[in-house]
């Protein structure tokens, strides 16, 4: 009895996991995590050093506002606004990449929909003009 219930539960779980949306979501999360690491490296290792050099050889990761006096054996309390600036740049680059990707996907989907859409039928005006033409042709034949 218990084994049958477990098998049914396993079958339901397998059906759930194999649905397209769940698999697509899992792939998206994995690719997103890898992409996040690439963007973080791009910002930290390429963009921020260039920006720091342009504005006076500043290392953004070292920009802090120290709070109070350091306590022996503990890390200095500080507001690390330089790291915050780096995270903002990270976010903006990721947002830009996602925006461009979505625009590209939407453009491709629109082209696909336009290609697969059936040709529109004649408009009311075209039908009326065709009827008038046919009527005039009948009159001309008499």
From Swiss-Prot:
Q: List the disulfide bonds.
A: none
Xref: SUPFAM superfamilies: Gated mechanosensitive channel
Spans through the membrane: 15-35, 38-58, 82-102
Question: What functional role does this protein have?
Answer: Channel that opens in response to stretch forces in the membrane lipid bilayer. May participate in the regulation of osmotic pressure changes within the cell.
MF terms from GO for this chain are:
mechanosensitive monoatomic ion channel activity
Name the source organism: Fusobacterium nucleatum subsp. nucleatum (strain ATCC 25586 / DSM 15643 / BCRC 10681 / CIP 101130 / JCM 8532 / KCTC 2640 / LMG 13131 / VPI 4355)
Question: Where does the UniProt entry say this protein principally localizes?
Answer: membrane
Keywords of this protein's UniProt record, alphabetized?
A: Cell inner membrane, Cell membrane, Ion channel, Ion transport, Membrane, Transmembrane, Transmembrane helix, Transport
Describe its membrane topology: Multi-pass membrane protein
> Which GO BP terms sit in this record?
monoatomic ion transport
GO CC, alphabetical: membrane; plasma membrane
* Entry keyword annotation includes Cell inner membrane: yes
Task: Give the family, as the similarity comment puts it.
Answer: Belongs to the MscL family.
The record's subunit annotation is: Homopentamer.
Q: State where the protein is found.
A: Cell inner membrane
Q: What is this protein called?
A: Large-conductance mechanosensitive channel
């Amino acid at each position: 009895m218990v084994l049958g219930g477990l098998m049914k539960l396993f079958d339901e779980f397998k059906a759930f996991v194999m649905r397209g949306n769940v698999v697509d979501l899992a792939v998206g999360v994995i690719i997103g995590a890898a992409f996040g690491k690439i963007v973080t490296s791009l910002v930290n290792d390429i963009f921020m050093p260039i920006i720091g050099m342009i504005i006076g050889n500043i290392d953004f990761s070292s920009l802090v506002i120290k709070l109070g006096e350091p306590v022996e054996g503990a890390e200095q309390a500080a507001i690390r606004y330089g790291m915050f600036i780096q995270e903002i740049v990270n976010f903006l680059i990721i947002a830009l990449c996602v925006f461009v990707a979505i625009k590209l996907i939407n453009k491709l989907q629109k082209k696909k929909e336009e290609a697969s859409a059936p040709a529109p039928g004649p408009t009311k005006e075209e039908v009326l003009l065709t009827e008038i033409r046919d009527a005039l042709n009948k009159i001309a034949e008499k």
